[in-house]
């Protein structure tokens, strides 16, 4: 089967790789000059199935009000004047109940755990290198309330059989030695020893090269204008004056998927803006050894070979990609507070990206009401974590194989008023 994949971020490239492995003839099209040059370029770097959680959670609405008045708040909202933004935020609020949170987190952990298994198999088979580490991840708490609140997440972890360790302040240094110097600031931590880290952009670039060896064709610097219909099916994708034809099409355009599919399939994927800095390591003993997540600032601090990546925060501000100095100051504050002297933040590079977020936090992977149109988008802050599993799952669905995990609640049909009701989404 001839397949066109639209988008060459980590989700698009993994889709192409697994489709090619399944025997399909794959072409990837992207407007950028190479793979992983947008949202996948400088993300936080962690592969964290156990921390796969929706932003829509109990207590978040009240926290959001408080964050409006805080300088270093992890969430910011600026109305962009669109009805879609208001609809998306309303649907997100509806998912902030305990029952919806449990369902959504369960879905996310299921896919994320499977994705890590797929990544490990891929690594064993290909030997792909991306400055990866398998030292687990550590969430640190600054208040007793945060520490006590971890019980809800632990219940979900136990249900999913995810190994974990709840650590006291004195035990944190066992996982991250440099935290010994600042343990008095912390009330404890939740460690997931099965989590991993790595450079997403490096991984995507090298996987694209492996995909090319399997016969995948990459067309960069190519405009992606619209899908052309023939009856109830996609005939091709319009790229400037050219119509690129195929048997099936995969939309993996991240935050741009919603507008691209407008009038065809309505999906609730909204850009959630995030930031990162990448600083050179200047003192090994004061630097992290894996990933540390600061629960207060919602920031992840990740160790690469000779760099520290600090990323996080969320802004609901539309497609604004301006770099706000105040956000850089928050990232620097967090890493310098937990790992003083570990990295030189004065020499850090500053970046922003738009994560494609659904209101329930779960990505959209699989079939659509259009017979030969498939989606792999909406992974939010977990595109790197979920990429391999999403790509393998999609390849199985498109190849007529039974996926290794439950997949029906991951497709766009969970938003539709009825199967086939492409213009009657439940969130509208």
From Swiss-Prot:
Keywords: FAD, Flavoprotein, Oxidoreductase. It comes from the Bacteria. InterPro entries: DadA, FAD-dep_OxRdtase, FAD/NAD-bd_sf. Signal peptide: none annotated. It is an enzyme of class 1 (oxidoreductase). Oxidative deamination of D-amino acids. This is D-amino acid dehydrogenase. The lineage of its organism: Bacteria, Pseudomonadati, Pseudomonadota, Betaproteobacteria, Burkholderiales.
């Amino acid at each position: 089967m001839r397949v066109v994949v639209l988008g060459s971020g980590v989700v698009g490239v993994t889709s192409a790789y697994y489709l090619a492995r399944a025997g399909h003839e794959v072409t990837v099209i992207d407007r950028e000059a190479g793979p992983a040059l947008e949202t996948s370029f400088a993300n936080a770097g962690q592969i964290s199935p156990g921390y796969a959680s929706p932003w829509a959670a109990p207590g978040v609405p009240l926290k959001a009000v408080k964050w409006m008045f805080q300088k270093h708040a992890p969430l910011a909202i600026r109305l962009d004047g669109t009805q879609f933004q208001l609809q998306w935020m309303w649907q997100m609020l509806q998912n902030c109940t305990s029952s919806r949170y449990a369902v959504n987190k369960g879905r996310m952990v299921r896919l994320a755990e499977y994705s890590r298994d797929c990544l490990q198999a891929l690594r064993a088979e290909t030997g792909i290198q991306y400055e990866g580490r398998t030292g687990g991840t550590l969430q640190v708490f600054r208040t007793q309330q945060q520490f006590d609140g971890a019980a809800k997440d632990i219940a979900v972890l136990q249900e999913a059989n995810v190994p974990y360790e709840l650590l006291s302040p004195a035990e944190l240094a066992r996982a991250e030695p440099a935290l010994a110097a600042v343990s008095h600031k912390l009330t404890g931590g939740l460690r997931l020893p099965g989590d991993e880290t790595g450079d997403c952009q490096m991984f995507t670039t090298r996987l694209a090269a492996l995909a090319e060896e399997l016969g995948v064709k990459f067309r960069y610097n190519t405009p992606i204008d619209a899908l052309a219909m023939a009856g109830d099916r996609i005939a091709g994708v319009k790229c400037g004056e050219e119509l690129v034809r195929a048997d099936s099409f995969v939309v993996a355009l991240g935050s741009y998927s919603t507008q691209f599919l407008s009038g065809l399939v309505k999906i609730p994927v909204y850009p959630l803006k995030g930031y990162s800095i990448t600083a050179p390591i200047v003192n090994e003993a004061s630097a992290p050894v894996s990933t540390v997540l600061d629960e207060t600032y919602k920031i992840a601090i990740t160790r690469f070979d000779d760099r520290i990546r600090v990323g996080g925060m969320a802004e609901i501000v539309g497609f604004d990609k301006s770099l706000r100095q105040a956000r850089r100051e928050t990232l620097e504050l967090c890493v310098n507070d937990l790992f003083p002297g570990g990295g030189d933040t004065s020499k850090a590079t500053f970046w922003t990206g738009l994560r494609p977020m659904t209101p329930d936090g779960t990505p959209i992977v699989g079939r659509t009401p259009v017979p030969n149109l498939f989606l792999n988008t909406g992974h939010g802050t977990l595109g790197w974590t979920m990429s391999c599993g999403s790509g393998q799952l999609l390849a199985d669905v498109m190849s007529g194989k039974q996926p290794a995990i439950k997949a029906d609640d991951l497709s766009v049909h969970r938003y539709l008023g009825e199967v086939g009701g492409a213009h009657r989404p439940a969130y509208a």
